[in-house]
Amino acid sequence: MKVVILGAGVIGVTSAWYLARAGHEVVVVDRQDGPALETSFANAGEISPGYASPWAAPGIPAKALRWLFMRHAPLIVRPGFDPAMVRWLVAMLGNCTARAYRVNKGRMVRLAEFSRDRLIELRQETGIRYDERSQGTLQLFRREKDLAGVAKDIEVLKADGVPFELLDAAGCIAAEPGLANSASPIAGGLRLPNDETGDCFKFTNALAELAKAEGVRFVLGRRIDAIVASGNRIAHVRTDRGDISGDAYLVALGSHSPLLLSPLGIRLPVYPVKGYSITVPIVDPARAPVSTLLDESFKVAITRLGDRIRVGGMAEISGYSNDLPPARRATLDHCVGSLFPDAGDLSQASFWTGLRPMTPDGTPVIGATGYRNLFLNTGHGTLGWTMACGSGHVIADIIGGKRPAIETGDLAIDRY
């Protein structure tokens, strides 16, 4: 079967890999000149199944109101009349209940843990390298009142069987020795030892090369203008340089997926939630993080990637804007500078933004559509890197008519 994949980010490329390994002819189409040049380019670098949680949770509406007035706010909303934004926000608020949170988190953890296992398997099989580390994630609490609220998180971790360590300040410094130099107080932390880190851009490009060796063809620098249907099937994809046809089609275009699906009558509830990152060259390795640290106060991740520190996070709801406000950069500088002072040269840091494809319930949309040969693998939000290998594996099974190794029925678009 010839499968045409739209999107060469980490989701599209992992899907291509598993489809090719299953014996399919695969073509990947993307408007960029290389893989992983949009949302997969400079994300936070964490692979954290244990922290796979929906943003829609009990108490979030009240927290969001407080965040809007903070100087270094983890959430920014730029209001405007965008019906898609309004629908998305209303649907997200509808998921901020205890029952919905449990259901959605269960789906996310299931896929994230399956994905981590597939990543380990892929690494062992191919020897792929991407500045990877397997040294866990530390969720750091600067304030005692935030640490006191971790009991609910621990209950969820216990229920899901996720290993964890509750640490005091000394324990946090033992896990991340660079914190001994912190200019900020440390109340304690929650460490998940089974989490990993790695450079998503390096991984995606390395896997693309391996996929080419399996026969995958990349058609890059092509703007995708439309998905053209004939009856209940997709006939071809229209690009700015001609049509591309196949037997099956997979949409893995992240936040841009709804724009191409809407003319087909498919309302995909995915909306872009903007994130920011800086990548800082390390000047003192002893002061730098060892793995990934999640700064609970600012909702920012600080990750060691080889000789660099990646600092990423925040959430801005502002449509498809790609501007880079200095205030967002200042927040990232403050986070890493206060916890790991003099570890990196902030004057040489690169500043980046990406549009995360978020669903109202936090769970990606993976599976078939009402068109017999059109499939979706999108809407992973902040967890595209964490869920990539698992998502690629299950969609390859679904397209190939095989039963996936995990339950995927509740990931399909018909849940909406």
UniProtKB/Swiss-Prot annotation:
Oxidative deamination of D-amino acids. This is D-amino acid dehydrogenase. FAD binds at residues 3-17. Belongs to the DadA oxidoreductase family. HAMAP family: DadA. GO terms for biological process: D-alanine catabolic process. One of its GO terms (cellular component) is plasma membrane. Pathway: Amino-acid degradation; D-alanine degradation; NH(3) and pyruvate from D-alanine: step 1/1.
